[in-house]
Amino acid sequence: MSKKITLACAVCSSRNYSTNKNVSNQSTRLEVKKFCKTCGKHTLHRETK
């Protein structure tokens, strides 16, 4: 069962990306380094509720 999640920048808290996550395989929050257009650089993006 996959769940739609939103990734938010850890620096400026803007929600830039949305993706799917398999809840049965991953119980922890997703953290990915991606480009933030607001900050203008690659930052850590965390899964939001």
UniProtKB/Swiss-Prot annotation:
The lineage of its organism: Bacteria, Bacillati, Bacillota, Bacilli, Bacillales. GO terms for molecular function: structural constituent of ribosome. One of its GO terms (biological process) is translation. This is Large ribosomal subunit protein bL33A. It comes from the Bacteria. Belongs to the bacterial ribosomal protein bL33 family. One of its GO terms (cellular component) is cytoplasm. Keywords: Ribonucleoprotein, Ribosomal protein. Pfam families: Ribosomal_L33.
